[in-house]
């Protein structure tokens, strides 16, 4: 088991401890405070469970960079917080905890609903600004981004100053979190980890387990469309609408398109022509399961001869997981 603390060599393993489960906010705060008081670094990775290789890759990085690695395992119907947008894939929290400990988590936080939310329904929420949230909410329940931001703000408040790890796969929630910690002066440093892809290019995702065989075979079209769009930009295309049309055309051949966008990587504002640090964002509905993907692109200048550079790893170089295990195949 690798979850034994001291990730950055500060000798705080005895404070962090090997993998253990706690159930109260006070226990989490006591552990984090002790490590910080000794000069150590606290890491936090928020997830709702159903761990797969994408999650585990983030956890391993957190464990390598922090002296105490904390992960929650909590998902329950909470009026005012939870959303129907959270998919109903299977969760085995005991198995998830074992995987997390093996990857380097020191502390799994498994609170009861009454511990997390003693007064229901919840009356306070973090509401992302319309320019960050509105264009993307059509893919799912409009309350999803609010739910995610509210839950993570609460976790960051519980843990205290920390490095807050997340993945680049969900670029819109990542952007919301980055803005939230700045706007609300939350003492969390957002650490974004690259997308983990399976050998065929599909993002590692818990949602993959809900796909039919036909949809699973078609799903890599998302990344294929993104790479085709990148190739078009590298060949000199600077018309953002042309890139959006290319993405929609490729993806609509296999699934209804929720959105296919080219945006500023920081603000999520639509761009045209293509210039600067950009993100290509796509989402499609595979028989009720919404899959998301994105790639980063730097266009140094809007001129036709400008250089374009892809900023994500090639297919299969980050992770290729066995298809027989849902926890490593999606």
Curated annotation (Swiss-Prot):
Tagged with keyword Protein biosynthesis: no
SUPFAM superfamilies: Nucleotidylyl transferase (SSF52374)
Protein's pathway: Cofactor biosynthesis; (R)-pantothenate biosynthesis; (R)-pantothenate from (R)-pantoate and beta-alanine: step 1/1
Subcellular location: Cytoplasm
Pfam families xrefs: Pantoate_ligase (PF02569)
Residues given in the record as ATP binding sites: 167-170, 196, 204-207
Extra remark beyond the main annotation: The reaction proceeds by a bi uni uni bi ping pong mechanism.
Subunit structure: Homodimer.
Function noted in UniProt: Catalyzes the condensation of pantoate with beta-alanine in an ATP-dependent reaction via a pantoyl-adenylate intermediate.
Full protein name: Pantothenate synthetase 2
Species the sequence originates in: Frankia alni (strain DSM 45986 / CECT 9034 / ACN14a)
Gene coding for it: panC2
């Amino acid at each position: 088991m690798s979850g034994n603390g001291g990730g950055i060599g500060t000798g705080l393993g005895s404070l962090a401890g090997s993998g253990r489960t706690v159930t109260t906010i006070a226990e989490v705060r006591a552990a984090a405070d002790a490590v910080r008081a000794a000069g150590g670094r606290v890491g936090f990775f928020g997830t709702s469970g159903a761990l797969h290789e994408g999650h585990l890759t983030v956890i391993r990085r957190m464990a390598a960079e922090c002296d105490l690695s904390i992960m929650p395992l909590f998902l329950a119907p909470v009026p005012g917080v939870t959303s129907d947008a959270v998919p109903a894939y299977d969760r085995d929290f005991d198995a998830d905890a074992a995987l997390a400990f093996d990857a380097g988590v020191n502390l799994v936080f498994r609170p009861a609903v009454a511990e997390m939310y003693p007064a229901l329904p919840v009356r306070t929420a973090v509401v992302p600004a319309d320019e960050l949230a509105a264009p993307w909410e059509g893919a799912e329940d409009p309350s999803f981004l609010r739910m995610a931001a509210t839950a993570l703000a609460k976790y960051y408040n519980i843990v205290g100053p920390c490095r807050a790890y997340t993945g680049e796969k969900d670029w819109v929630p990542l952007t919301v979190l980055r803005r939230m910690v700045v706007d609300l002066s939350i003492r969390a440093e957002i650490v974004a980890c690259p997308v983990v892809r399976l050998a065929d290019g599909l993002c590692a995702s818990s949602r993959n387990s809900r796909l039919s065989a036909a949809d699973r075979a078609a799903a890599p079209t998302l990344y294929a469309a993104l790479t085709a769009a990148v190739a078009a930009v590298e060949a000199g295309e600077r018309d953002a609408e042309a890139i959006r049309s290319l993405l929609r055309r490729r993806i609509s051949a296999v699934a209804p398109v929720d959105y296919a966008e080219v945006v500023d990587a920081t603000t999520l504002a639509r761009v045209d022509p293509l210039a600067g640090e950009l993100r290509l964002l796509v989402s499609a509905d595979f028989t009720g399961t919404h899959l998301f993907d994105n790639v980063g692109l730097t266009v140094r200048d809007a001129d036709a001869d400008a250089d374009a550079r892809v900023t994500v790893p090639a297919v299969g170089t980050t992770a290729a997981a066995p298809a027989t295990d849902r926890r490593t195949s999606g």
